[in-house]
């Protein structure tokens, strides 16, 4: 049984080797680059492959080559699988697995951390200190979490964990989800619609998957519903927000500040070291220039605990498919 791991990062390699030592009957090889039409032939002779989130594959040749090579499974080292073309997957008889839950705490903790950074104006404080300005001024006056209403949009494992953390800090927590979780009724109040939540929340945090019905759910119309001076935290998917509309709301002051960890065009820069001027996306560059935006590059998942869980789950799912023809974490 053989598995080839494409796009293996230096922080993943020790975990891959650890998993391999615990599964002597499985040969796991590492290839540092993402899978492309030029290198997909390296999968020949392997039963399964593993890819990561920046490996966008929409070329029919890649899927045909995987099928001809005898590959049975594409095991994604991600929760979201929007980088995969499922019509082509199904046409070629391949199975895709994901890692639906690797560490809800990792992403939830970043969401809460960044919310607190927004409320306490940490970036502005740092700027003032770097300028030698140590005064207590109205511009730096912060807000306590216990004084606000937090709107959690999406209450799956990550959203639920975020809600619990915000509640622990004393916030009034409201939520919207198409499928409410009654187990959370003691810590939050569900609203009947997204609009109802947006009207009441001082800060919203996004934790929904990117689907046809959720794409650009935060747009000029929904932003207009929100309180003046509200905050937005997005550690979900970049496509949940219409970036241009958000920029306009930030410039007008309708939205006071935003902490963004995911972006619709993040494939242009994720996990790359770029030279000045190399990143030319005008909306990304605008966000980077705005003092009221905290910009992180899809780091929500990036903890040692989460990386180990991701690698272990991905490789174990690949083995499950190879042995049984399906897997618990199968997504097609």
UniProtKB/Swiss-Prot annotation:
Pfam families named in the record: 2-Hacid_dh, 2-Hacid_dh_C
Entry annotated with the keyword Membrane: no
Record's keyword annotation contains ATP-binding: no
Recorded superkingdom: Bacteria
Keyword annotations from UniProtKB, A to Z: NAD, Oxidoreductase
Pathway assigned in UniProt: Amino-acid degradation; L-leucine degradation
MF-aspect GO terms: D-lactate dehydrogenase activity; NAD binding
Active site: 237, 266, 298
SUPFAM superfamilies per the UniProt record, alphabetical: Formate/glycerate dehydrogenase catalytic domain-like (SSF52283), NAD(P)-binding Rossmann-fold domains (SSF51735)
EC nos: 1.1.1.345
Family from the record: Belongs to the D-isomer specific 2-hydroxyacid dehydrogenase family.
Function in brief: Involved in the reductive branch of L-leucine fermentation. Catalyzes the NADH-dependent reduction of 4-methyl-2-oxopentanoate (2-oxoisocaproate) to (R)-2-hydroxy-4-methylpentanoate ((R)-2-hydroxyisocaproate). For the reverse reaction, the enzyme accepts (R)- but not (S)-2-hydroxy-4-methylpentanoate. Can also use 2-oxopentanoate, 2-oxohexanoate and phenylpyruvate but not 2-oxoisovalerate and 2-oxobutyrate. Cannot use NADPH.
Listed name of the protein: D-2-hydroxyacid dehydrogenase (NAD(+))
Organism of derivation: Clostridioides difficile (Peptoclostridium difficile)
């Amino acid at each position: 049984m053989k598995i080839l791991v494409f796009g293996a990062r230096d922080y993943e390699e020790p975990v891959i080797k650890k998993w391999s030592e615990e599964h002597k009957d499985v040969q796991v090889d590492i290839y540092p680059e993402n899978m492309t039409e030029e290198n997909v032939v390296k999968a020949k002779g392997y039963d399964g492959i593993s890819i990561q989130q920046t490996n966008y594959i929409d070329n029919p040749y890649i899927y045909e080559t995987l099928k001809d090579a005898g590959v049975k499974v594409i095991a994604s080292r991600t929760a979201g699988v929007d980088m995969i073309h499922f019509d082509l997957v199904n046409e070629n008889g391949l199975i895709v697995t994901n890692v639906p839950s690797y560490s809800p705490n990792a992403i939830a903790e970043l969401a809460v951390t960044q919310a607190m950074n927004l409320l306490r104006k940490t970036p502005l404080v740092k700027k003032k200190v770097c300028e030698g300005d140590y005064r207590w001024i109205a511009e730096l006056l912060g807000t306590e979490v216990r004084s606000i209403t937090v709107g959690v949009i999406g209450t799956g494992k990550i959203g639920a964990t975020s809600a619990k953390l915000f509640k622990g800090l004393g916030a009034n927590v409201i939520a919207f989800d198409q499928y409410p979780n009654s187990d959370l009724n003691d810590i939050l109040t569900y609203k009947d619609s997204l609009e109802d939540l947006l009207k009441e929340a001082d800060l919203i945090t996004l934790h929904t998957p990117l689907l046809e019905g959720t794409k650009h759910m935060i747009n000029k119309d929904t932003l207009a519903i929100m309180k003046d001076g509200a905050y937005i935290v997005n550690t979900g998917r970049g496509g949940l927000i219409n970036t241009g509309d958000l920029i306009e709301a930030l410039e007008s002051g309708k939205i006071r500040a935003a902490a963004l960890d995911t972006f619709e065009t993040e494939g242009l820069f994720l996990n790359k070291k770029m030279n000045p001027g190399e990143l030319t996306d005008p909306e990304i560059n605008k966000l980077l220039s705005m003092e009221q935006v905290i910009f992180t590059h899809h780091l929500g998942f990036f903890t040692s605990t989460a990386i180990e869980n991701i690698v272990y789950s991905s490789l174990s799912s690949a083995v499950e498919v190879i042995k049984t023809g399906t897997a618990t974490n199968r997504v097609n």
